[in-house]
Amino acid sequence: MKKIIICLWALIVCCWGCEDYLSVKPSNVQAIRTYDEVKALLGGHLRMYAEPDYDKLAGTSIPYIGSDIWTFLHFYGDDIDVDTYVKNRYIFGNIKNLYVESANWKNTTQPGVIWKVYYTNIGFFNTIIDELSRVEASKEQADIVRCEAKVLRAWHLFKLMQYFSPYHLNKYGLPVNLDAQKVAEYDASRKTQEEVYRIIISDLTECVECTTEPRSTYNVFYDKNIIHAILAQVFLYKGDSGAKADDDYENAASHAKSALEALKLQSTEDYEPFP
């Protein structure tokens, strides 16, 4: 009987201890409380672009970041010499097979990788914008962070549209959630192309018209020339899509002109051929 009482007492003590253990507040959760913390959180992401671990694409001066995400996008662009690119040393000689599979739309992993990474990034930008609204900051302080996040979010949405939305079918846009508080509760059905482009163009237009000057020591994509260039691409691509409008090409030309006005073209005297 004495042994039974001892065992019961040990069990009670153990359960009591477990209850206390489970009630301990976690110490590995870092809440965002200040503007500087929000700014630093986005700044960590921007560092990838500002100080990338990159080489240059063979035969070009285009920065190359060693990631399948960027590799896939290069395959569908027109700013590289494909013959030179697929023969260079990246991915230890397997890049030619990767290119052929991607060009023929037979790459089995590519869609999932792009979908996951781009939507994860969009969720991150949503969080930045949401947290920014909860901290104290001046208009200028808020603008440089919010515009940076909105330009990046719009660019990611545009790339997803190019890859996953059937070009001429307006009803097949993308699922879009801009509310960081509704991660599992939002409407995940496809919006129309018109609805998605409206979001993209609205965010980019808001940023290009923002009166707060970008900070050269912080901002990367919140750059009026970059925003004009992205808007030119968006309107040009949209111009023959299921969401096309009569003024798309006119808008594309206008934004392209604005993007080029601040650029100095290379003269023949300064030209250096690629090695």
Question: Locations of the language-model features?
Answer:
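Membrane-proximal, proline-rich intrinsically disordered regions
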Residues: 18-74, 256
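Short, surface-exposed recognition loops and adjoining beta-strand edges that mediate ligand/DNA contacts
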Residues: 28-33, 67-70, 213-275
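Conserved, well-structured interaction surfaces
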Residues: 88-164, 191-194, 205-215
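Inward-facing hydrophobic residues that define packing positions of alpha-helical scaffold repeats
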Residues: 122-125, 197, 204, 249, ...
